[in-house]
């Protein structure tokens, strides 16, 4: 059974790696988004569409089609096009290098938008049509406030992953089932992995272990609580915006959850037992014929808490579903996409828990050791939560302390009678020494006159408002600009700061542009104005602006990227 469990787990990881490899394969031709870089700006009462066309590629004039929703589209005048003998369509009018297209719109009503369809080719290869939907700024009706319309407000672009997912949902509802597969891939990310010890402790870590069918029911119930909460929170964020997400990540909420998980871990150590009131307990026992640890209601509630913990993590699939809800207002399809995404995130948890329930022994002293081990693992959740609000330099000490406590318990609790077990003990002592590195390094730094050189953090100009951003974009005319939207409670934002922005090659690449950062932690009025202007649905979000101060919407980043991934992204600018 153990062999089958590891075979299944290896297969899941292999599928994820194969998927990643497939997406990383570089095609012979540029992607459509790379060949035809689209951007738009709304200013001076007019909408400007712009395509930067790669060398050797071209756009068909006849395939550029515009349609307005809740607005009236004026006559569109194209610049002079080049006549070209196309091997597919005969003589056609095309555009090379770049195309700037002014568009006049009037009679803008509630939630106006413009849909743009275009198609291009290169020698020997033709692309399918691309579609972009742009939310329109009411200032296009004649409000000449330069400040209110000087910046683009669109995020829907052909090659932004979240936008492609949103468009796929709009064009084909069957693509919704792809979110289930995307969720499985997200299950192995830092936002979801902390859910495993909580579920495993509930199903495996109590006295009378359930049978396989009962373990499946409990784990499925847990995932349902997590998925439904994740879905409802996602729809709420799409409807209300970032303020709701900020509220969930406030210090009071995070500290409360951390205290709860610490108490649960203490109960796993046998310090006390968590029991419901007797009347509730009797009813739950009658329904489930299990002790309190296995009650379905309890497990569902813990799943809800897990959904709260996982909710702030922004990824391209999550952003795509939220973007679809925000643009279409279709709560049913958007909610189902969010549910399938969360369900996919929970499937590996179900499999690991059910197989672990079968593999681990169900009685004897080993059971108490397993329960204590899960208590240590559960203590990782408070650290995961508290690290969002503590300065980053405290986090290594928290993890080191937990690892030292766990290894110390493991060394003292195992029986070392054979030569093999003695070797294991030596390895554990070595691991104990390695995990003490943050504390040893702290002592060394306080007693040594020479500190080890560290990689400097990326220098960023701090801004606080949309008005200040406009001023900076004007000041940096002729230079590309990057804007990082950061919050203390955003885990992936801290990962960018720690792992990506400290990379020397990343810093060298960013040295050619102006790098700005705005702190969204407090969700001030200035934060809200900027967020609404750019239609930001979650963090982390990184925006890029060209030399003229227009956002390059096709390269907007949502979700964490490693240094290598970020460098590849920058090469597309």
Swiss-Prot record:
Topological domains on the Cytoplasmic side lie at: 197-227, 273-292, 353-365, 415-425
| Organism superkingdom | Bacteria
One GO MF term on file is: protein-disulfide reductase [NAD(P)H] activity
Record has rRNA processing as a keyword: no
Q: Which function does this protein serve?
A: Required to facilitate the formation of correct disulfide bonds in some periplasmic proteins and for the assembly of the periplasmic c-type cytochromes. Acts by transferring electrons from cytoplasmic thioredoxin to the periplasm. This transfer involves a cascade of disulfide bond formation and reduction steps.
What Pfam family is a match for this entry?
DsbD_TM
Q: Which cysteine pairs are covalently linked by disulfides here?
A: 121-126, 191-313, 490-493
User: Where in the cell does this protein reside?
Assistant: Cell inner membrane
Q: How does it sit in the membrane?
A: Multi-pass membrane protein
Which residues belong to the signal peptide in this entry? 1-20
CDD domains per the UniProt record, alphabetical: DsbDgamma (cd02953)
Q: Ranges in the Periplasmic compartment?
A: 21-175, 249-251, 314-331, 387-393, 447-573
Protein's UniProt name: Thiol:disulfide interchange protein DsbD
Residue ranges annotated for the Thioredoxin domain, each copy included: 440-573
Q: Which species?
A: Haemophilus ducreyi (strain 35000HP / ATCC 700724)
Which EC class is the enzyme in? oxidoreductase
Q: Which Gene3D superfamilies match?
A: Glutaredoxin, Thiol:disulfide interchange protein DsbD, N-terminal domain
Q: Which family does it belong to?
A: Belongs to the thioredoxin family. DsbD subfamily.
Q: Which GO terms describe its cellular component?
A: plasma membrane
What PANTHER family does the entry give?
A: THIOL:DISULFIDE INTERCHANGE PROTEIN DSBD
Give the GO terms filed under biological process for this record: cell redox homeostasis; cytochrome complex assembly
Instruction: Kindly report the protein's main subcellular placement as a broad class.
Output: membrane
Q: What is its EC number?
A: 1.8.1.8
Q: Which gene encodes it?
A: dsbD
Q: Which reaction does it catalyse?
A: [protein]-dithiol + NAD(+) = [protein]-disulfide + NADH + H(+); [protein]-dithiol + NADP(+) = [protein]-disulfide + NADPH + H(+)
**Transmembrane parts of this sequence:** 176-196, 228-248, 252-272, 293-313, 332-352, 366-386, 394-414, 426-446
Record's keyword terms, sorted: Cell inner membrane, Cell membrane, Cytochrome c-type biogenesis, Disulfide bond, Electron transport, Membrane, NAD, Oxidoreductase, Redox-active center, Signal, Transmembrane, Transmembrane helix, Transport
């Amino acid at each position: 059974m153990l062999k089958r469990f590891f075979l299944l787990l290896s297969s899941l990881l292999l599928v994820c790696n194969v998927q990643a490899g497939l997406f990383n394969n570089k095609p012979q031709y540029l992607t459509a988004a790379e060949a035809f870089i689209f951007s738009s700006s709304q200013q001076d009462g007019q909408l400007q569409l712009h395509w930067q066309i790669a060398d050797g590629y071209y756009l068909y004039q006849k395939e550029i089609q515009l349609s307005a929703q809740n607005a009236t589209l004026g006559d569109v005048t194209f610049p002079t096009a080049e006549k070209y003998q196309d091997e597919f369509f005969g003589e056609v009018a095309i555009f090379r290098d770049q195309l700037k297209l002014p568009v006049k719109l009037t009679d803008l009503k509630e939630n106006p938008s413009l849909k743009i369809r275009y198609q291009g080719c290169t020698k020997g290869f033709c692309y399918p049509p691309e579609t972009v939907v742009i939310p329109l700024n009411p200032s296009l009706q004649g409000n000449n406030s330069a400040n209110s319309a000087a910046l683009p407000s669109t995020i829907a672009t052909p090659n932004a992953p979240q936008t492609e997912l949103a468009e796929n949902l709009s064009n084909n509802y069957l693509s919704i089932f792809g979110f289930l597969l995307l969720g499985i891939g997200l299950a192995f990310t830092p936002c979801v992995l902390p859910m495993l010890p909580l579920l495993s402790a509930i199903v495996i870590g109590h006295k009378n272990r359930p049978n396989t069918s009962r373990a499946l029911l409990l784990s499925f119930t847990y995932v349902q609580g997590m998925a439904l909460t994740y879905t409802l929170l996602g729809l709420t964020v799409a409807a209300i915006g970032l303020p709701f997400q900020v509220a969930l990540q406030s210090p009071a909420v995070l500290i409360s959850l951390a205290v709860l998980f610490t108490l649960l871990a203490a109960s796993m150590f046998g310090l006390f037992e968590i029991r419901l009131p007797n009347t509730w307990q009797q009813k739950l026992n009658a329904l489930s014929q299990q002790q309190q640890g296995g009650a379905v209601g309890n497990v569902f509630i813990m799943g809800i808490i897990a959904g709260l913990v996982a909710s702030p993590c922004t990824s391209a699939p999550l952003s795509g579903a939220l973007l679809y809800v925000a643009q279409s207002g279709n709560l049913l399809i958007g909610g189902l996409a969010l549910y399938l995404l969360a369900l996919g995130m929970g499937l590996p948890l179900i499999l690991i828990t059910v197989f672990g329930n079968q593999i681990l022994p169900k009685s004897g002293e080993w059971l108490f050791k397993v329960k204590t081990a899960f208590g240590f693992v559960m203590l990782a959740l408070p650290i995961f939560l508290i690290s969002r609000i503590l300065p980053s330099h405290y986090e290594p000490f928290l993890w080191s302390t937990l690892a030292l406590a766990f290894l110390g318990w493991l060394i003292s609790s195992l029986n070392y009678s054979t030569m093999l077990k003695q070797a294991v003990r030596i390895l554990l002592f070595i691991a104990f020494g390695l995990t003490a590195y943050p504390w040893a390094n702290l002592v060394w730094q306080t007693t040594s006159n020479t500190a080890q050189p560290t990689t400097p953090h990326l220098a960023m100009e701090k801004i606080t408002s949309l008005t200040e951003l406009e001023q900076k974009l004007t000041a940096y005319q002729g230079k590309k600009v990057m804007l990082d939207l950061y919050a203390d409670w955003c885990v992936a934002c801290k990962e960018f700061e720690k792992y990506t922005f400290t990379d020397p090659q990343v810093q060298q690449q960013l040295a050619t542009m102006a790098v700005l950062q705005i702190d969204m932690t407090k969700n001030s009025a200035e934060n809200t104005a900027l967020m609404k202007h750019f239609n930001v649905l979650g963090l982390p979000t990184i925006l890029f602006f060209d030399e003229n101060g227009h956002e390059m919407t096709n390269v907007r980043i949502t979700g964490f990227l490693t240094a290598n991934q970020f460098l590849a992204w920058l090469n597309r600018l």
